[in-house]
Each structure stands twice: as C-alpha cells, then as structure tokens.
C-alpha cells in the first residue's frame, strides 16, 4: 500500500519579508497541498522565534481548515507543558466540532523556545524543571474520557463542547522516550527525523514493538517527518542547501533572526570548523532533485517501518517551498481526493464515537 504523504509547515519568514507574507504563503501552500492529494498539514508552536510566524497553531488550523476541503489539518504540535490540559481539550474539541473528521492534535514535550520565554509561558521556576509530561498527558486523556478517579478534584469538570471528543492524538518526539510513551498510551507517534535523523529507525521500531492497542488506535500508526531540499537539479539542490547550513549555524549560536536568503548564504565564508560542526549535528535534510530525495526518504521510511511520510523544508522562499510540494507529490504519485488510510482513520473515528456514546 502506498504511504500517505503529508506536510509540516513551519511558516518561515525570509529575510526582507514580513510575518504577514509568511502566513499568507502558508495558506496558499496548504490550498496547493489539498489540491495535489496530500493527506494532512501540520503547524508548529514556536515562541520568541523571529524567523517563524506561527506561535499559535490552533489559529492556523482553523483558518487553513476553512480554506481547504479534504486535507486533514493539525498541530505538529502543541507543546503540552506550556498549556493547561483542560484548555487544550476545549480548544481542540471545538476545532473538531467546527471541522469534523479533519483535525489532528499532535503533542510535544519541549518548550518550543528558550528558557526565559518558557518561564514567561509557564509562570514558575518549578514548572521549568518539572518532568511531568506523562502526567499532563494522562490528565488530558482523563478530561476527554471523563476517567478521573472518584476522589479526584477534577472529576466533575466536563470540557466543552461536551458532545464532541478530541480528534486523533499523536505524540511528537525525536527520541525513544516519546516513542515508548506513545506506544504505552496507545496513540499515534510522529518522529522528528528533521531534528534527529539518526534516531528514526530505533525509535519507530521500538514504538511498533511496544504498542498497546487502544480504543483510539487499534493498531500503531507511525509518521516519519523529514526535512527535504528539492532542487531543479542535483547541483541546484546542493546550492540551496547552503541556506540549511547557515540556518543551522545560526541556530547553534543562538541567532534567531529571519531565515537567510540564498544570496546571503552564498556569500557566507564558512570555516572548516563550522563545516565540521554542521556535519556533526543530528539535524539533517535530504538534498537532491525530486527523484534523489524520494529515493533517500523511501529508504529511511522502509528501514524505520514508517506508515506515513511527512515532509518539511528549511527553505524559506515561497517558490522553493512550492516546488518541493509539487515535486514530492509527483514522485510519491499522489492522486487528489484519494487517501490510502481513509479506512484506517474511519475505524479510529468510529472507536472514538463509541467511547463518547
């Protein structure tokens, strides 16, 4: 069965442009992905990141879902420690009520920002050091399932809308920790190979081997998220990859400005030490023309036993991002309006409705 192809859009701001332009580009690209037959598009949560326009994925989700007709739209993801589980439950129940069967909720454990900004989000030093992600996840699930113990102080709280369940839940991660937690909870799992490509195979295999079936997910479902740099030719792709290199170098040194342009990256005098540091970083982008990138991605997806591939790119220019979306749709042989996992998610939705009933 062909693997579904999905899109992670970080809503990057290229040097010399505005956040408004970045958001409008993301809308246009989502409409394009919808027309080409992509299965889902996700938006991330980042704070105090001047190079990224989306700090509130739930707002992007509502707008994009209203502008598209078939595409699933979700958070990739909401950083659970930054928010009260009750608030997340009510926000995504409402999104599900507005767009039934088209919303995804991906959950992450990282702050999505620096320490000071995380403190501003969480309001206490204790919250910064607490390793309570599993407890927060359990609380979110208990709110949705009305499954708090009889003596729990939250047992009488009913998230609104009360007659709508949460959409399908996914845990996001770049390590074995999140893979095991997703498996034990019987949830979907999305591995961030664009952050840690080397860890994809062991984490996804561990998830599948440890999976405990649940009413939400009778079977495991693993998404492999990869960064791709797709050029018109191999040489063009290698030229574009200079943007990735300069971006990674800036991220490593804490420079969080707008994404560099190709001209800016081409002028930068990389030292041998900087080249070595970039090569040693676990973040990786598959570079080449569309056929070369497809071959590399397919090989990793086969090795990791991924059920679905999700592509993103660190290239900020709209034309480069548009080419990536079009070319990946071509080499993955997408057919607009057809989804190879519609039946699977129909089963998941039916199970969720059975819980609600």
Model-flagged regions — what are they?
Residues 2-19, 81-147, 189:
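Flexible, glycine-rich active-site loops centered on histidine and acidic residues
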Residues 20-32, 174-180, 290-299:
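Short, acidic/polar
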Residues 5, 33, 37, 45, ...:
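Conserved, mostly hydrophobic/aromatic
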Residues 175-198, 203-204:
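A conserved active-site cap/scaffold subdomain adjacent to cofactor or substrate pockets
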């Amino acid at each position: 069965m062909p693997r579904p192809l999905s899109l992670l859009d970080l809503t990057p701001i290229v040097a010399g442009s505005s956040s408004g332009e970045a958001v409008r580009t993301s809308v246009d690209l989502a409409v394009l992905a919808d027309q080409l037959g992509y299965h889902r598009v996700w938006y991330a949560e980042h704070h105090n990141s001047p190079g990224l326009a989306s700090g509130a994925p739930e707002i992007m989700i509502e707008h994009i879902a209203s502008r598209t007709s078939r595409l699933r739209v979700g958070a990739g993801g909401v950083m659970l420690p930054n928010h009260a589980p009750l608030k997340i439950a009510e926000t995504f129940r409402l999104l599900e009520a507005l767009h039934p069967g088209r919303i995804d909720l991906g959950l992450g454990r990282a702050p999505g920002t620096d320490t000071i900004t995380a403190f501003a989000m969480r309001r206490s030093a204790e919250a910064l050091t607490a390793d309570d992600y599993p407890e927060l996840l359990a609380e979110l699930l208990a709110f949705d399932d009305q499954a708090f113990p009889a003596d729990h102080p939250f047992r009488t709280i009913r998230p609104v809308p009360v007659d709508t369940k949460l959409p399908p839940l996914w845990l996001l991660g770049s390590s074995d920790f999140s893979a095991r937690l997703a498996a034990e909870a019987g949830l979907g799992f999305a591995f961030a190979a664009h952050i840690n490509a080397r860890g994809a195979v062991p984490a996804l295999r561990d998830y599948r081997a440890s999976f405990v079936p649940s009413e939400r997910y009778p079977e495991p479902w693993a998404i492999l998220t990869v960064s791709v740099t797709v050029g018109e030719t191999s040489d063009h792709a290698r030229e574009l990859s200079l943007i990735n290199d300069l971006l990674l170098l800036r991220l490593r040194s804490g420079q969080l400005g707008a994404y560099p342009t190709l001209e800016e990256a081409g002028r930068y005098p990389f030292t041998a030490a900087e080249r070595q540091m970039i090569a040693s970083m676990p973040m990786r982008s598959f570079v080449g023309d569309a056929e070369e990138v497809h071959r590399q991605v397919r090989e990793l997806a086969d090795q990791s036993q991924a059920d679905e591939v999700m592509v993103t790119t660190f290239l900020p220019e709209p034309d480069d991002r548009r080419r990536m979306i079009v070319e990946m749709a071509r080499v993955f042989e997408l057919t607009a309006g057809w989804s190879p996992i519609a039946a699977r998610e129909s089963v998941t939705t039916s199970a969720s409705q059975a819980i609600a009933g």
